[in-house]
Every structure is written in C-alpha cells, then in structure tokens.
C-alpha cells in the first residue's frame, strides 16, 4: 500500500465490516469514497452531476432574464395580454424547459470532458497542462463532428483554448506567497 506514492510497507489484512468498530467502519467508508472519487468513473460521474446542477441554475437564471427585455419575440409580446395566472404558468413552464435543457447540456459536456481528460491522464501517466488541452480538443471536436469537419476543427480549437485558459488561471496560484499583505 502507498501513501501519496510512497510505499509504507505491508498493511494488516482488512477485517470484515461486522468486526470493525464504528470509527473503523467510518474510516473504511471514507477511504472507499475517496478511492471512488479519484477514479475515472468517479470523476466522470461527479462532473456530470455537478455540471447538471450548475447548468440548471444557469438555465433558470437566463430564462428569468428573457422576460426582462421590452423588445422580444412575438411570444413575449403576446404573453403580456394574458391574465396573470396564465402568464405565470407559461413563464414557469418555459423556465423549467430552459433550465432542464441547459442542465442536460452542461452535464453532458462536463461528463465527456472529465472522462476524456482522466483517460488521457491515465494513459500518459502525467499530470500537466497538455491533458486538459487534449481533452478539450477531443471534446470540442466530438461535440461538433455532426456539423462537418470544419466545425469539428473549430470546436477542437475553441474547447482546447478555453481549457488552456482555465488551466493556466487555476495553476497561476503556484507562486510563492507575498512577503506581506500589502504586496498582493
């Protein structure tokens, strides 16, 4: 067994769950959950679920903003002539549809990207910026392939650039901390 990649020697055999104390059961459960969350299927599922939740909130917010503009489609102009109850029913129905649609898209994209990135990282056995860029390219091309090769190329470039920008931003905190609070 290893601890952060360092071999710690032979471990005692695992006891059956019935023979463990409550603390040992909790530690074993936490160990198994962490092991699952660090695996590729675990990362993929977590990215899909969190993308679904984030997409749902984003879709709900964007749908609520759609009724705020005075210039809109004929459907929005037509809504203002209906009674209040029908207006609310139509708006909430539309918000639910948009929210669900956005949630599905965010969840799907997050799941595909995370799965591809984890697979590339496992195959390369390296954790660097090229994993995210490659995963972004594959994900972008895969999502746009139905529209043709040019769209796949643009999708590849766009997702790779976005992934590079996000990775560069998230990895920029690796600098040493400032000497005092005034030099931030």
UniProtKB/Swiss-Prot annotation:
Membrane topology type: Multi-pass membrane protein
Mutagenesis / variant outcome for changing residue 156 to S: Abolishes disulfide bonds
Residue spans crossing the bilayer: 45-65, 151-171
GO MF, any single term: protein transmembrane transporter activity
Biological processes per GO annotation: protein insertion into mitochondrial inner membrane
Disulfide linkage: 40-118, 137-156
Keywords tagged on the record: Disulfide bond, Membrane, Mitochondrion, Mitochondrion inner membrane, Protein transport, Translocation, Transmembrane, Transmembrane helix, Transport
InterPro entries according to UniProt: TIM22 (IPR039175)
Result of changing residue 118 to S: Abolishes disulfide bonds
Gene Ontology cellular component terms for the protein in this record: plasma membrane; TIM22 mitochondrial import inner membrane insertion complex
Main localization category: mitochondrion
Chain residue ranges for the region called Disordered: 1-26
Location(s), subcellular: Mitochondrion inner membrane
Function: Essential core component of the TIM22 complex, a complex that mediates the import and insertion of multi-pass transmembrane proteins into the mitochondrial inner membrane. In the TIM22 complex, it constitutes the voltage-activated and signal-gated channel. Forms a twin-pore translocase that uses the membrane potential as external driving force in 2 voltage-dependent steps.
Subunit and interaction comment: Component of the TIM22 complex, whose core is composed of TIM22 and TIM54, associated with the 70 kDa heterohexamer composed of TIM9 and TIM10 (or TIM8 and TIM13).
Record-linked PANTHER family: MITOCHONDRIAL IMPORT INNER MEMBRANE TRANSLOCASE SUBUNIT TIM22 (PTHR14110:SF0)
Family indicated by similarity: Belongs to the Tim17/Tim22/Tim23 family.
Protein name in the entry: Mitochondrial import inner membrane translocase subunit TIM22
């Amino acid at each position: 067994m290893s601890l952060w990649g360092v071999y710690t020697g032979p471990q005692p055999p695992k006891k059956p769950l019935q023979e463990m104390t409550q603390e040992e059961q909790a530690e074993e459960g936490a160990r198994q959950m962490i092991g699952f969350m660090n695996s590729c299927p675990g990362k993929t599922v977590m990215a899909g679920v969190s993308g679904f939740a984030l997409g749902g909130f984003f879709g709900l917010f964007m749908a609520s903003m759609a009724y705020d503009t005075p210039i809109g489609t004929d459907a929005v102009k037509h809504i203002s002539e209906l009674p209040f109850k029908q207006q609310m029913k139509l708006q909430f129905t539309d918000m639910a549809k948009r929210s669900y649609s956005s949630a599905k898209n965010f969840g799907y994209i997050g799941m595909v990207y995370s799965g591809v990135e984890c697979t590339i990282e496992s195959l390369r056995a390296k954790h660097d910026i090229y994993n995210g860029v490659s995963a972004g390219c594959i994900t972008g091309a895969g999502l746009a392939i139905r529209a043709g090769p040019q769209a796949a190329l643009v999708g590849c470039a766009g997702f790779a650039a976005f992934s590079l920008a996000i990775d560069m931003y998230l990895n920029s905190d690796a600098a040493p901390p400032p000497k005092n609070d005034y030099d931030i």
